[in-house]
Amino acid sequence: MGKPEFERLPVYQVSEKLANEIWRLVQDWDEFNKDSLGKQIIISADCIGANIAAGTVQEQQYNQNLVRQARGCLYETIHALRLAWNRKLITENQAKKIKPIIDELSSKLNAYLKSLGS
């Protein structure tokens, strides 16, 4: 069996990269922050790729809706990262590493949604 279609999508690949970077980032937090904001940010980042993947096996209209949900999850992830930054849980170097991934993913998500006719 070959790779599922979603694994070949550049937008999915970038979403996976972001989710893995956030996972590594949260691992250094104390238990309280891992259990609260950490879980939220990991789940929201993981859901970006999950929605992209789920959409690839749906009809176009449902795929569009799932990609919109993925974009909403990206916004939730950005919100959580802003909170983490304000709470001094993220260093400047970590932020500099994650920001380009977010920028690329945002652009790719919007382009992917547009390519689906939305």
Located regions from the model:
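Amphipathic alpha-helical assembly/interaction segments
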Residues: M1-S118
